[in-house]
Amino acid sequence: MCAALSVRALGAKKVFGLLLPERDSSGFSTERGRQLAEHLGIEYQVHDIAPALEALGCYQQRDEAIRRVVPAYGEGWKNKIVIAGGVEGGINFFKLVVQSPGGEQQSVRLPLREYLQIVAATNFKQRVRKTMDYYHADRLNYAVVGTPNRLEYDQGFFVKNGDGSADLKPIAHLYKTQVYAMARHLGLPDAICNAVPTTDTYTLPQGQDEFYFALPYAQMDIALWALEHGRSAEELAVALKMTPAQAQRVYDDIRAKRRATEYLAAAPELLPG
């Protein structure tokens, strides 16, 4: 979407695209990226960032934390982190899901130490990608366009100094459902318009609602709009076909994430001289 808007504003010759897969990336993501770039007629490059991540210890640090929880984890295994709690009440917590080479899955609640290490290690991916973004921006004397939508930006679903860094963020005021609608309006390929939002960070398939949000994005958009427009939990419950208690839980989760991630968008603290 951001690439398409950039082309409309500046023309295809002034837009440059980057596809930055690594060894855990889905091949579908790279293929959709190529399809979009070719549809828009922009120049693009593909860089495999796996060697850089390997050198930084991204995979090693992640796997060490996983093995402290699942000692059998090793070569050929797959993984992802999922959030538990949702709208059913109680405190949200994270679980590690692993799959053996034979296809058997198991899940285990993640202790805080291991959760933080896994997330810190995987955040290398977004930060290395942003380093590549700014290398090419400097090389071309271009600006870096950020991609967070309103839901992601409001709820802190980005990595500080990673995918959260950009010179402009043209869709940060748009709900995710609006982004999809605009993509269809602009005639972007069906593979883009129909793609399910995914973090594409872990080796097992993972939707954004599994990892971070309490509900699928279409429902989260409604909830965020309702909260910002002063609608009661009872009104939200009717719209989302859930109980008022569940709707209140969604509101509480939105507010909690705002508090917990406020620092991500904060400017550095400057001390008086």
Over which residues does each language-model region extend?
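ATP/NTP-dependent adenylation/nucleotidyl-transfer catalytic domains that generate, transfer
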Residues: 1, 5-8, 13-16, 24, ...
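Short alpha-helix adjacent to the SAM-binding motif of class I
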Residues: 28-36
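Acidic, Mg2+-coordinating phosphoryl-transfer loop and its flanking beta/alpha structural elements
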Residues: 21
